[in-house]
């Protein structure tokens, strides 16, 4: 990852699995991920490493794969079917967020070539104060547009190429239309049949599979396509939430200019959690529960005299 990632005032995992929580944060940051599988030559153990990358990262190279039939008489693996499909996707992404300290809306817009189609815009307005400057908004607009445009050109293929790996680029040869072009698989389905004759071919309803053979099918995009994940909606907390107002020790409570105070939730762990809370079991870096002005985030205060 080469891009600088912003720090959030508070990040909460609520009613979502660890995997859903982590991938949601990665998608919000405009990042993608893949698994790198490795096996030690001296053992039967295998290892899978989660690799996180941005569009500037260079994809691993799976080499050259020819477009040819796949059968037992062939010495090399090949791709036996390879097609292309196009989809109508947005061409413009606009994000805007009101920034109370700057008394203005901070936003940006990213655009892509529309061709003969009319402009198709996606407009997103996140919470207030989401962007401190236009550069951050521009990064978010571009990341969302890149994620929305991944399905613009998809290639569906099938064959026996065992070197294919999601996120790793390959060069296609001997194809009438795509010879010499590079592609990156984004999804692969593997089917391997052993030679023990246990009727797996009949169970899979795939008579084209021979005993002791391997086949796959995959979806790929052109290698120049920026790979990003589309941000997903975060779970919502229904009803009110209790919290404690925090600030500078032994000092009067000082709200912000916009009548906001800083709060610390009881489920935040740290050195000084609220009564009933737990101490931090991992990092004690700022942002957990220090019990002072560094905790949590600013929230507006509603009073009965508010207009």
What are these regions (language model features)?
Residues 1-307:
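Amphipathic alpha-helical and helix-coil boundary elements used as assembly
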């Amino acid at each position: 990852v080469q891009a600088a990632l912003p720090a959030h005032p508070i990040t909460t995992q609520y009613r979502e699995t660890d995997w859903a929580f982590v991938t949601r944060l990665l998608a919000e940051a405009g990042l993608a991920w893949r698994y790198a599988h490795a096996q030690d030559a001296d053992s039967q153990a295998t290892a899978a490493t989660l690799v996180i990358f941005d569009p500037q990262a260079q994809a691993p190279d799976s080499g050259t794969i020819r477009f040819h039939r796949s059968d037992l008489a062939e010495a090399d693996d090949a791709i036996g079917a390879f097609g292309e499909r196009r989809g109508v996707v947005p061409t413009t992404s606009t994000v805007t967020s009101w920034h109370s300290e700057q008394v203005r809306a901070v936003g940006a817009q990213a655009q892509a070539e529309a061709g003969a189609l009319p402009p198709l815009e996606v407009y997103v307005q996140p919470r207030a104060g989401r962007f401190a400057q236009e550069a951050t908004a521009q990064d978010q607009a571009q990341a969302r547009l890149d994620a929305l445009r991944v399905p613009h050109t998809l290639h569906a293929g099938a064959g026996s190429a065992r070197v294919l790996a999601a996120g790793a680029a390959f060069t296609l040869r001997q194809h009438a239309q795509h010879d010499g072009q590079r592609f990156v698989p984004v999804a692969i389905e593997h089917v391997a049949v052993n030679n023990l004759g246990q009727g797996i071919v009949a169970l899979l309803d795939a008579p084209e599979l021979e005993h002791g053979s391997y086949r796959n099918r995959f979806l790929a995009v052109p290698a120049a396509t920026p790979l990003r994940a589309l941000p997903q909606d975060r779970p919502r907390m229904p009803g009110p939430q209790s919290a404690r107002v925090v600030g500078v020790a032994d000092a009067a409570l000082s709200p912000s200019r916009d009548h906001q105070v800083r709060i610390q939730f009881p489920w935040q762990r740290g050195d000084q959690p609220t009564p009933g809370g737990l101490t931090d079991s991992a990092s004690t870096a700022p942002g957990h529960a220090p019990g002072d002005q560094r905790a949590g985030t600013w929230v507006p205060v509603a009073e009965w005299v508010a207009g």
